């Protein structure tokens, strides 16, 4: 928390939505919920660099063109959300702490055990209505042009 505020600062995270048509790639650790690839942005990194690093570490996917689409503010994390259209020949493989890597139809995500931000980000990208969090709140969305990512 900052000394002037009782509100905790949001941790910044690079989140990547990998798409193949109507399918989205989700990853999971052992005995964990499914999630979008991504992770914490290091203090010396730009969000794009963190997104590339996390995607490579978690899925082995490299040299994909990532497009920054929006920021998504959850209760504890600020997600810098990127999209990558993955060629059919690319085969993601679990790496680092990830034990499962799997493609799902975007419509299947709401029936999977996922975090609220994962579900909301996928729904936003596929033009579906934004679902509310369990406490009734929804995430905050900011377009890249509203806030610099440096």
Describe the residue ranges of each PLM region.
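Charged phosphate-binding loop/patch that engages nucleotide di/tri-phosphates or the phosphate backbone
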Residues: 117-150
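Conserved N-terminal beta-strand and adjoining loop/helix that marks the start
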Residues: 1-24
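Conserved Nudix-box catalytic region and its N-terminal flanking loop in Nudix hydrolases
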Residues: 19-57
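Active-site-adjacent beta-strand/loop module that shapes the phosphate/pyrophosphate-binding cleft
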Residues: 72-108, 117-130
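Residue-level signature of the cytosolic catalytic core of signaling kinases
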Residues: 43-44, 94, 114
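Short connector loops at helix/strand junctions that flank enzyme active sites
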Residues: 11, 19, 63, 76-79
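A short coil-to-beta-strand element that immediately follows conserved catalytic motifs
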Residues: 61-72
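Short histidine/acidic/glycine/proline-rich micro-motifs that form metal-
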Residues: 41-42, 108-110
């Amino acid at each position: 928390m900052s000394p002037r505020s009782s509100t905790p600062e949001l941790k910044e995270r690079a989140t990547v939505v990998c798409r193949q048509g109507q399918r989205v790639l989700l990853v999971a650790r052992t005995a964990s919920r499914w999630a979008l690839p991504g992770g914490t942005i290091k203090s010396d990194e730009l969000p794009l660099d963190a997104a590339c690093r996390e995607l490579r570490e978690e899925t082995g996917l490299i040299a994909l063109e990532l497009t920054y689409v929006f920021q998504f503010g959850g209760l504890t994390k600020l997600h810098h959300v990127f999209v990558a259209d993955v060629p059919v020949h690319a085969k993601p493989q679990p790496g680092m702490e990830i034990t499962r890597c799997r493609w799902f139809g975007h419509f299947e995500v709401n029936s999977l055990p996922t975090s609220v931000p994962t579900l909301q980000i996928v729904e936003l990208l596929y033009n579906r209505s934004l679902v509310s969090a369990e406490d009734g709140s929804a995430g905050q969305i900011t377009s890249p042009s509203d806030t610099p990512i440096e």
